[in-house]
């Protein structure tokens, strides 16, 4: 569209290849007016177009898909096609040109951190899924075993339950071994684990195995499935640990990471994740903007004489950042650092009668405000 809203070119398809992108660039350079380009966030699929056009010197802006959805809600007769979406985005760019800001990539280390954070989330999600699958299998071969040996995937080579599954397969196998032989082999096996309490549970586990009824305890196919789950779980956890180590190495080169790690509740895992989700702190003009980015803001609602005093957070922001910060609040509640302002703020909100999780999210708000103030001091 030109500045008068006239359609200069009807929507057309274009592959993300050099020949077709070069043809688009040539066409854009033919226009007499300055060109403003607006793209919609589409995962990582818009990055080739964004990179190519920026390299050619065009100002490229990027809009959130939710904004475009709400912008299209004003239409009475709604229609959803790629061609109509293209015209809708162009109209939005023309109408909102006064507030569009060209997209700029963060420093490479921030981009790398964010990429690794997404990979870490995927590995951890896979770990959680494998744990559910493994417990489902254990309900058929070793019902109740997790009451004595918890399923912990950290340091899988020394996990008591994972070693136990690999060695004994099912309760039927334990019954065949007999009490004396089982207790002897169990004591030897538990020397490989870091669980301090596991060695004392041998007799209780044997009694559980003796009294339990298994449904597929002698099935070699379920034994194979269990072993595969254990191996996959160990591999996924090791992959997640490797990624978090890479994130720690990058984070240590960023000045504000020391500020973040010095805050109570932030450890070697949550620190890099929070830093990855926030990115460069200098891109936020205020602590309020940082909370809004996290979706932890509560927009005002007022109409006439009515003014709401019981508002909910918007959740229009990074859910990964909210989750990581919420885990920091959980750590504060466990460790109870009496001199920590965030912990004291959570206690204050709880004493005011706020629900448990509402008080924690209020703590997240204060946590991000404190972090913003301390981190920005490094760049002043």
What are these regions (language model features)?
Residues 1-380:
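A detector of single, family-specific signature residues
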